[in-house]
Amino acid sequence: MTFGIEFVPSDPVLKIAHYAKLAEQQGFDNVWITDHYNNRDVYSTLTVLAMNTNSIKLGTGVTNPYTRNAAITASSIGSLNEISGGRAILGLGPGEQATFDAMGISWEQPLTTTKESIAAIRGFLAGEKVTMDGDMIKFGGAKMAFKAGDVPIYMGAQGPKMLELAGEVSDGVLINASHPKDFEVAVKQIAAGAKKAGRDPKEVDVAAYACFSIDKDAAKAKSAAQIVVAFIVAGSPDMVLERHGIDPAAKADIGGAIAKGDFGALMGGMVTDSMMDAFSICGTPDDCKARINELLDIGVTQIVAGSPIGPNKEKAIKLIGKEIIG
């Protein structure tokens, strides 16, 4: 098993660099930085992290094939790989409708766009002249002018078709989930894609990109994660909620509270214990270890501690290092 950690660049970059250095010291393998237009730039942030760390791998968690041309993405991640001494990982997924609507970008054929973009990016990183006349991605003989080196490509994937594609074409899969029930389904879909491509499914790193909250006081850990879980519930398909025995009608109630900014209602019981169990790794070190072991038994090979990490981020990083990574 490897252990990753996610940071959102809504915080100042040097603050994130401090956390990344601490995570490296505590034995984390990977740091993942989210990519969203209203936060600090993902590649600028990762470059600062590269210059403030020595061994931890540095990934986009995740970027998308719409806001940047595939050649630009290849150049950016290749530059990061050079600066970091070969520590870059490209995490790329289809993104989501609401973000692109806000940006005025047409979100068309996400499965095809993701697949063709990965093929083009692999070509650029390999130093090839890329000529492509795909359904969505087209190049007329573009080529990078420097050697990028080997960069693993991970896919952010949720739905069955994306998970199968990840098994076909990616080195790893970042899945926003925390519960064994979700991975029982996902691991099978990834394996089906790998077998379709003639690959061993074990070649694909399966990462639980989880809402994570750890503290010696379980109640404090739970409280820190409730708002994050509320957003997860509000954005979950009915099928996923039903898998966990959660009434889909609760999604509308929680979504309404979020829209009103009524976080008191969310913290006051609207986010139930069953929701916390379904959509987070949360509690004391022993609580978190128990869930992690369940995920490893199903086929998860990387745990990513995503937001909020804990009620106190610095203490949580140290606690994970001491009590879980060991």
Curated annotation (Swiss-Prot):
<keyword id="KW-0560">Oxidoreductase</keyword>
<comment type="pathway">
    <text>One-carbon metabolism; methanogenesis from CO(2); methyl-coenzyme M from 5,10-methylene-5,6,7,8-tetrahydromethanopterin: step 1/2.</text>
</comment>
<dbReference type="InterPro" id="IPR011251">
    <property type="entry name" value="Luciferase-like_dom"/>
</dbReference>
<dbReference type="GO" id="GO:0005737">
    <property type="term" value="C:cytoplasm"/>
</dbReference>
<dbReference type="GO" id="GO:0018537">
    <property type="term" value="F:coenzyme F420-dependent N5,N10-methenyltetrahydromethanopterin reductase activity"/>
</dbReference>
<keyword id="KW-0484">Methanogenesis</keyword>
<dbReference type="Pfam" id="PF00296">
    <property type="entry name" value="Bac_luciferase"/>
</dbReference>
<dbReference type="GO" id="GO:0006730">
    <property type="term" value="P:one-carbon metabolic process"/>
</dbReference>
<dbReference type="InterPro" id="IPR036661">
    <property type="entry name" value="Luciferase-like_sf"/>
</dbReference>
<dbReference type="InterPro" id="IPR050564">
    <property type="entry name" value="F420-G6PD/mer"/>
</dbReference>
<keyword id="KW-0963">Cytoplasm</keyword>
<dbReference type="GO" id="GO:0019386">
    <property type="term" value="P:methanogenesis, from carbon dioxide"/>
</dbReference>
<protein>
    <recommendedName>
        <fullName>5,10-methylenetetrahydromethanopterin reductase</fullName>
        <ecNumber>1.5.98.2</ecNumber>
    </recommendedName>
</protein>
<dbReference type="InterPro" id="IPR019946">
    <property type="entry name" value="MeH4methanopterin_reductase"/>
</dbReference>
<comment type="function">
    <text>Catalyzes the reversible reduction of methylene-H(4)MPT to methyl-H(4)MPT.</text>
</comment>
<comment type="similarity">
    <text>Belongs to the mer family.</text>
</comment>
<keyword id="KW-0554">One-carbon metabolism</keyword>
<dbReference type="GO" id="GO:0016705">
    <property type="term" value="F:oxidoreductase activity, acting on paired donors, with incorporation or reduction of molecular oxygen"/>
</dbReference>
